[in-house]
């Protein structure tokens, strides 16, 4: 049910990562395709709905269109150079209203293996903790204790020039983000080149060409959903009388994860997760388009356009030995390649008082869309040699799955609107 995202007239794939399965387990937060756009390059955004969306983009616009127009340099006369730099800090804005009266356990009885917080009232009385030590029973603020202040550093420079009907725009932007979750970071580089020019002195023929390259590298994206590796889920549901700081030393002398929960399906120590359950991914993306527009009169024009959206993503997940999932560790890797090419034409006529006080607005267009998505995932399963991350180092043969999806869409669309100047 997503709207169609169109950047400078060309549709882009607004993929979403980390979609929930039937159990609410969505894996790593992979973000979405729209986040690849550099916000500093955006000139305007428009939301189209209903007939106006369908008239321009056909059946793909059934859920509406987010129309993004990026900077072209045409608004500035002469030469312009812009340098920007910014630092942003983020913390958890809203926290659930958690009770701070009762400790670990249920029905008023203390239990050092319980995940619940309905044990005895925490009044400093002595209890035996999960290590077998005698400690006073208190409650703790584990949310602020575990999560840190996230930071985002953004630096960019843009160049724009408009001389004699030709406009040029170029920009380079770099962002380095450190998440509120420890050891999680995201780095992104965005490069844009665009040129717009008229081919004749009467300015009836116009050419617009643009290319945008994005490189993104992520380390330890946070895990989402009902997942034992989800730090948010673990911290928010941790018994109120457990101090998460006790688990910063996350492995014992044998290299096994330290954690209070010895049940059959325990959650994982969130400190251990950030160090020993590592995921990495790299995405390289290219967005490009070129258009030729002819406007013989001030009320009629026709435009031909070609555009492409191409990206590759490689990813891997390493689970070290000593955790709950596998005593020797796990290793998986995967890749995805996607492209979508669009070729379209659109004729537009708008004229008031065409016949007496009757006017109208007419559009007619067509589009050829070619799309392909190729996915491959491979897993070594449980490792034969602990912490040697290779597909050939599995106890069993590696499992490989692949998926190839091709789509082609030919469409014609148009609209007619009449108006009466009363």
Feature annotation, model-predicted:
Residues 10-49:
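Short acidic/polar hinge/loop motifs at secondary-structure boundaries
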Residues 163-164, 200-202, 295-297, 352-357, ...:
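Outer-membrane beta-barrel channels and translocator barrels
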Residues 2, 7, 75-138, 180-184, ...:
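Surface-exposed loop/interface segments of Gram-negative outer-membrane beta-barrel transport/assembly proteins
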Residues 96, 145-149, 159-163, 251:
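Outer-membrane beta-barrel initiation region
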Residues 22-25, 288-294, 308-310:
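Alpha-helical support elements that line or immediately flank enzyme active sites
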Residues 39-82, 152-154, 175:
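A beta-strand signature from Gram-negative outer-membrane beta-barrel systems
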């Amino acid at each position: 049910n997503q709207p169609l995202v169109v950047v400078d007239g060309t549709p882009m794939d607004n993929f979403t990562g980390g979609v929930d399965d039937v159990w609410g387990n969505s894996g790593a937060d992979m973000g979405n395709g729209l986040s690849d756009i550099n916000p500093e390059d955006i000139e305007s955004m428009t939301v189209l709905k209903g007939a106006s969306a369908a008239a321009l983009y056909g059946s793909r616009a059934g859920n509406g269109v987010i129309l993004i127009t990026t900077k072209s340099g045409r608004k500035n006369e002469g030469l312009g150079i812009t340098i920007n730099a910014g630092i942003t800090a983020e913390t958890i804005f809203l926290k659930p209203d958690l009770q701070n009266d009762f400790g670990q356990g249920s029905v008023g009885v203390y239990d050092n293996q319980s995940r619940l917080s309905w044990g005895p009232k925490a009044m400093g009385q002595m209890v035996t903790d999960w290590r077998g030590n005698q400690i006073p029973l208190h409650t703790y603020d584990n949310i602020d204790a575990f999560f840190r202040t996230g930071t985002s550093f953004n630096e960019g420079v843009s160049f724009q020039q408009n001389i004699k009907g030709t406009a040029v725009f170029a920009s380079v932007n770099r962002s380095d983000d450190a998440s509120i979750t420890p050891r999680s970071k995201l780095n992104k580089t965005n490069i844009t080149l665009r040129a717009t020019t008229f081919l004749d002195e009467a300015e009836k023929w116009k050419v617009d060409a643009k290319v945008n390259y994005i490189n993104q590298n992520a380390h330890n994206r946070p895990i989402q959903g009902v997942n034992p590796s989800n730090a948010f889920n673990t911290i928010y549901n941790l018994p109120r009388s457990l101090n998460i700081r006790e688990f910063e030393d996350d492995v014992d002398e044998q290299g096994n994860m330290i954690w209070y929960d010895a049940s059959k399906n325990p959650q994982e120590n969130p400190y251990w997760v950030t160090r020993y359950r590592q995921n990495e991914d790299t995405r390289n993306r290219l967005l490009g388009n070129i258009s030729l527009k002819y406007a013989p009169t001030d009320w009629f024009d026709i435009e031909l356009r070609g555009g492409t959206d191409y990206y590759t993503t490689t990813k891997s997940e390493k689970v070290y030995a000593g955790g709950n999932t596998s005593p020797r560790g796990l290793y998986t890797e995967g890749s995805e390649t996607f492209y979508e090419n669009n070729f379209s034409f659109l004729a537009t006529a708008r004229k008031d008082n065409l016949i007496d006080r009757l006017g109208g607005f007419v559009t007619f267009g067509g589009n050829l869309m070619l799309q392909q998505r190729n996915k491959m995932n491979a897993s070594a399963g449980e490792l034969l040699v602990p912490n040697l991350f290779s597909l050939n180092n599995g106890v069993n043969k590696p499992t490989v799955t692949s998926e190839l999806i091709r789509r082609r869409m030919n469409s014609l669309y148009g609209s007619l609107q009449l108006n009466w100047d009363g």
